[in-house]
C-alpha cells in the first residue's frame, strides 16, 4: 500500500508564509498518525511519498520533508508542471532538481549504484498526452524519463481527463511507438519472472465504479480528498480493483495533500479524526479478514516489491552497463 501525494505547498500561488504553514502542519501531524497506525507484516509504520514539484523548489520547504524521510516515515520523489517543453530543457530541469534533492537534502534512492527517482506528471499530461498538447509539449518524455533514471511513473489514473491511458488496473511496461505522444497508451503487463518488457514501468492506481449509497455510480480512482474521503466501502473497492502481479496486490492511492481542505480530510482537525488514521485501520482489518498480508510502502519500496517478482530491473540503463542518467549529470 502506497500513498503518492502530488505535494504542492505553493499550489494556488499562495505566499511563502502559507506554504511554510502547510508543510509545518504535515511535519507536526504525520509522524503521530504514522506512529498510531497498525504495523504491517514487517513491523513497519506507513511511509508517505511526497512527489514535490521541480518548479516549486525552496530549500526551507523541502527540509521538513527530508527530516520525515530520515525518520523512515516519508520519502520525496519528482513532480513537474511544464508546458511547451523541449528535450534539452527537460533534461536540465530534472537533472538539476535531482542533484539538488541529493546534494542539499540527502534525498532520492540508489538502485544498483545509481540515483533513481519516481515520477508524477503535473496536470496529468504525461508524454504530451493531452489531445491539444497543453501542459507538456514533450513527445518522447517516457524515453527521457527512462534514460534519466526514473524507476517508475505513478501519474495514472487521470480520469476524467483525456490524458487517461487505455490500460487500467495493471502494473505494466510502456510499449508505445517512438515519436508519437502518449506512449503509455500501449503496454505489456508486468509478470512474474518477466523482467523488463518495455520503456518505462507504470504503477497505476485502482479504477472502477462504486455504488454504495448512490443512485448513480461514481468512478473510483483511488483519490483521497476533502470531497471524497476514505470510507470502509472504498477500502474494499480499492482492494477489489488494485493491480496484481501473481497473487500480490499493489494498491497505489493519491492525493493533493498540501491544500488546506485536503489536509483537513487527511490529517484531521481539532474537532475530528483524519481520514488517514481511519483508512490505515480499515486496510489492516479488511486485509486480515481477506487473509491478505499488508505491507506499507513508499513509492520506491513499491517498485522494489515489483522487482522482487519480475526479476532484476535497471532504471537509468538502456540495456547496457553505462548509466544514461549521466547525460543530466545524475549519478
PLM features per residue range, with description:
Residues 147, 152-166, 223-331:
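C-terminal domain-boundary segment and adjacent tail
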Residues 49-132, 155-156, 253-255, 298:
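Metal-dependent polysaccharide deacetylase catalytic core of the NodB/CE4 family, i.e.
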Residues 1-74, 82-84, 115-123, 143, ...:
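Active-site beta->alpha N-cap acidic-glycine motif
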Residues 7-10, 53-57, 81-83, 124-127, ...:
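Short, solvent-exposed loop/turn segments at secondary-structure junctions
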Residues 106-251:
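Active-site-adjacent pocket scaffolds in enzyme catalytic domains
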Residues 16-36, 60-62, 90-101, 134-144, ...:
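Well-ordered, non-membrane alpha-helical segments in soluble/globular domains
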Residues 11-24, 46-55, 81-88, 122-135, ...:
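The substrate-binding groove and active-site-proximal loops of carbohydrate-active enzymes
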Residues 2-4, 43-49, 73-77, 116-118, ...:
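Structural preference for beta-strand elements that scaffold enzyme active sites
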Amino acid at each position: 500500500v502506497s500513498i503518492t501525494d502530488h505535494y504542492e505547498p505553493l499550489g494556488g500561488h499562495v505566499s511563502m508564509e502559507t506554504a511554510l504553514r502547510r508543510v509545518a502542519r504535515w511535519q507536526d501531524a504525520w509522524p503521530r498518525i504514522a506512529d498510531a497506525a497498525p504495523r504491517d507484516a514487517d513491523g513497519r509504520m506507513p511511509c508517505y511519498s511526497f512527489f514535490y514539484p521541480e518548479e516549486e523548489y525552496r530549500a526551507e520547504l523541502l527540509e521538513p520533508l527530508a527530516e520525515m524521510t530520515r525518520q523512515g516515515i516519508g520519502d520525496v520523489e519528482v513532480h513537474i508542471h511544464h508546458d511547451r517543453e523541449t528535450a534539452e530543457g527537460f533534461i536540465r530541469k530534472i537533472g538539476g532538481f535531482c542533484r539538488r534533492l541529493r546534494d542539499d537534502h540527502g534525498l532520492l534512492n540508489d538502485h544498483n549504484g545509481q540515483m533513481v527517482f519516481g515520477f508524477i506528471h503535473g496536470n496529468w499530461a504525461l508524454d504530451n498526452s493531452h489531445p491539444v498538447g497543453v501542459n507538456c509539449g514533450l513527445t518522447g518524455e517516457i524515453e527521457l524519463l527512462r534514460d534519466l533514471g526514473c524507476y517508475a511513473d505513478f501519474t495514472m489514473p487521470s480520469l476524467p481527463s483525456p490524458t487517461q491511458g487505455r490500460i487500467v488496473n495493471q502494473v505494466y511496461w510502456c510499449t508505445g511507438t517512438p515519436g508519437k505522444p502518449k506512449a503509455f497508451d500501449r503496454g505489456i503487463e508486468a509478470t512474474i519472472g518477466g523482467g523488463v518488457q518495455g520503456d518505462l514501468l507504470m504503477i497505476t492506481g485502482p479504477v472502477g465504479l462504486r455504488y454504495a449509497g448512490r443512485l448513480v455510480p461514481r468512478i473510483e480512482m483511488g483519490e483521497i480528498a476533502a470531497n471524497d474521503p476514505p470510507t470502509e466501502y472504498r477500502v474494499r473497492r480499492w482492494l477489489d480493483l488494485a493491480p496484481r502481479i501473481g497473487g500480490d496486490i499493489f494498491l497505489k492511492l493519491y492525493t493533493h495533500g498540501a491544500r488546506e481542505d485536503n489536509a483537513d480530510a487527511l490529517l484531521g482537525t481539532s474537532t475530528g479524526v483524519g481520514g488517514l488514521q481511519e483508512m490505515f485501520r480499515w486496510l489492516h482489518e479488511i486485509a486480515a479478514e481477506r487473509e491478505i498480508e499488508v505491507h506499507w510502502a513508499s513509492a520506491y519500496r513499491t517498485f522494489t516489491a515489483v522487482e522482487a517478482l519480475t526479476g532484476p530491473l535497471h532504471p537509468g540503463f538502456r540495456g547496457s552497463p553505462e548509466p544514461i542518467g549521466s547525460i543530466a549529470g545524475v549519478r
